[in-house]
Structures are given as structure tokens and as C-alpha cells.
């Protein structure tokens, strides 16, 4: 199973990027990061549509798509692990996560998603969400392996 993360914006060196790289390095599944940026100077819905096109083009065709969205489902770590385990056991080749820009995701991405996932009702910095997601994927992997990393 291959994991993909398509995200708007380029991560600068610093703690948020270090957090993502720390957990990506621990994963037993490969996690490929695709950073996308709109080159046109547009705003509002037009920007969200342009970012949607870039995000969807960055993920493999046929991949299971998980969109991080504040209006998505809030899953406990164990439930997230079960979901990943189900996809793994169904021989899903690619699972792609997408993180939108400051204005959020276009409706097109939300409709295309197999799962809308939220990290709670609060709004989080997009660069920090990358590290939080990588940690939750690592945690899920450890839960599925029966490893004591997760102590809920």
C-alpha cells in the first residue's frame, strides 16, 4: 500500500516540517508528499477551484481519496486505524490524503473524497496538519501491528 499527501503550499524549514519528516521516516508504508501551488494570482472560489485541479492531478488515478476538512468526520485513532486496515486488507494500492489551502477545499474535492476527515472542530495551520496526519498514520500503523505506541 502506497500513501500520498497532496498539499497546498511549500513547507519551509522549521518545526512543522521537521514534525512531518519525523513521522514520515518512521512509517513502514511509503508516503510521498506532493506540494502544489497556484501560479496565477486569483482569490476566493476561483483559487479554490485552481487548487482543487492541482491537488487532484497530484494523486494517482483510482486512489482512495481522504480529504482533510474541518466539516469532515472526527475519528478516534482506533477508528482511523481500522479504516486504514480495511483499505490495506482490500489490497488498495494507493491512498491519497489532500490538504487544501487557507481558503479550504473546493466542493469538487469534497465530493470526490471517499472520506472527509477532521482533526476536531478547531482550525489548524495547514503546515502543522501535515505533521499531525503523519503522526496519526504512524499511530494507526502501530495500532494495527499491536505495538504499545498507542496507549489510549
UniProtKB/Swiss-Prot annotation:
CDD domains: RlmH-like. Its EC number is 2.1.1.177. GO terms for cellular component: cytoplasm. Keywords: Cytoplasm, Methyltransferase, rRNA processing, S-adenosyl-L-methionine, Transferase. It is an enzyme of class 2 (transferase). S-adenosyl-L-methionine binds at residues 68, 100, 119-124. The keyword ATP-binding does not apply. It catalyses: pseudouridine(1915) in 23S rRNA + S-adenosyl-L-methionine = N(3)-methylpseudouridine(1915) in 23S rRNA + S-adenosyl-L-homocysteine + H(+). Pfam families: SPOUT_MTase. It is found in: Cytoplasm. NCBIfam families: PRK00103.2-3 (NF000989). Belongs to the RNA methyltransferase RlmH family. Homodimer. PANTHER family: METHYLTRANSFERASE, RIBOSOMAL RNA LARGE SUBUNIT METHYLTRANSFERASE H. This is Ribosomal RNA large subunit methyltransferase H. It comes from Rhodospirillum centenum (strain ATCC 51521 / SW).
